[in-house]
Amino acid sequence: VLRTDGKENLMTSIEIAAAQDKEGKALVPEVCIFFENHLMRGNRTTKMNAENFNAFRSFNYPVLAEAGIHIKYNQAQIHVNKSKQELVPHYLLDTNIVVLKLFPGIQENVVATMLGTKGLKAVVLETYGSGNAPRKEWFIRRLCQASAQGIVIVNVTQCNAGMVEMERYETGYQLLQAGVVSGY
């Protein structure tokens, strides 16, 4: 027997997408995920479970709406674009990006290979905790070299909740000095 919450999620998603304010503008004018009675900002949401109905979480941002008998909108958290300009979608995105997830014992040849990728423009560096990384000389040197070549390196935490604070610990500060930028 297939058990699904898809019908309820779809119906409520359509209701929210169609909701308008007094001026006839979308009540929630942003990309969202609606799941298990919660509306979450799309770029702040992570799928945490492949089997449970409560599969998505927004760790560092509150829900935008909660559905029950009525839909309760969290207006203070919903982004309203005050610009008069129309949306101009960008279809040609640069995909010369790698995600470098750090792990204990990572070897120089692994880091060198990833940072040496032909045409590389950016690296998402997944660090420990609040932005910590290996303190090995070769690691910092490789990051400095990549940064000097114009490769943007963004430091993000591997943790589901919390953020990078590069000036909190010495290892994070070394990354900052190597040209790595905080991804928060």
Regions found by a protein language model. Name each.
Residues 1-68:
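Internal gly/pro-rich beta-alpha loop/helix module
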Residues 5-9, 26, 59, 95, ...:
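Conserved active-site and cofactor/substrate-binding residues in soluble primary-metabolism enzymes
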Residues 29-36, 101, 126, 156-157:
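Short beta-strand segments
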Residues 41-130, 135-136:
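Accessory alpha-helical/coil subdomains and C-terminal extensions
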